[in-house]
Amino acid sequence: MARIAGVDIPRDKRVEIALTYIYGIGLTRSRQILAKTGINPDTRTRDLTDAEVAALRAVVEGEYQVEGDLRRQEAMNIKRLIDIGTYRGRRHRLNLPVRGQRTRTNARTRKGVRKTVAGKKKAPAKK
C-alpha cells in the first residue's frame, strides 16, 4: 500500500480515485497532480513503481496543503471569525447555518436533534 501525506492509499483502485482518499484532494486536483507527474490516471495503485509513488508524494506534500495542515488552517479561520465577532463567527459559535439558509424550518443537520418545547397548558375549568 502506498503511503502519501500520512494516508494509506487503497491498492486496488485507479490512482485518480485513490488520491481522493487524502483530505484536501478531490477529483480535479487529483487529475492535476497526475498531469504534473505524467502518470496515467487509469493505472492501478498496486502497479505504480517506487519512483512514481515518490513523484506523487513530492508533488502532494510540496505543492498542496493537505490533511492535518489543511484541517488546522480551516479551524484557525473559523476561530478568527469568532474572535473578531463577525456575523459568520457568531453563527459558527451557535451551531447555526452560516451561509444565509433559513432556520425556521429545516437546518436540522446543523442544529441537531429537535428540542421539544412544551405547549401552553390550559387553565383548569372553574365551577
From Swiss-Prot:
Keywords: Ribonucleoprotein, Ribosomal protein, RNA-binding, rRNA-binding, tRNA-binding. One of its GO terms (cellular component) is cytosol. Pfam families: Ribosomal_S13. Residues 100-127 are annotated as: Disordered. One of its GO terms (biological process) is translation. Residues 101-127 have a biased composition (Basic residues). GO terms for molecular function: rRNA binding; structural constituent of ribosome; tRNA binding. Belongs to the universal ribosomal protein uS13 family. HAMAP family: Ribosomal_uS13. PANTHER family: 30S RIBOSOMAL PROTEIN S13/40S RIBOSOMAL PROTEIN S18 (PTHR10871), SMALL RIBOSOMAL SUBUNIT PROTEIN US13M (PTHR10871:SF1). Part of the 30S ribosomal subunit. Forms a loose heterodimer with protein S19. Forms two bridges to the 50S subunit in the 70S ribosome. Located at the top of the head of the 30S subunit, it contacts several helices of the 16S rRNA. In the 70S ribosome it contacts the 23S rRNA (bridge B1a) and protein L5 of the 50S subunit (bridge B1b), connecting the 2 subunits; these bridges are implicated in subunit movement. Contacts the tRNAs in the A and P-sites. This is Small ribosomal subunit protein uS13. It comes from Synechococcus sp. (strain JA-3-3Ab).
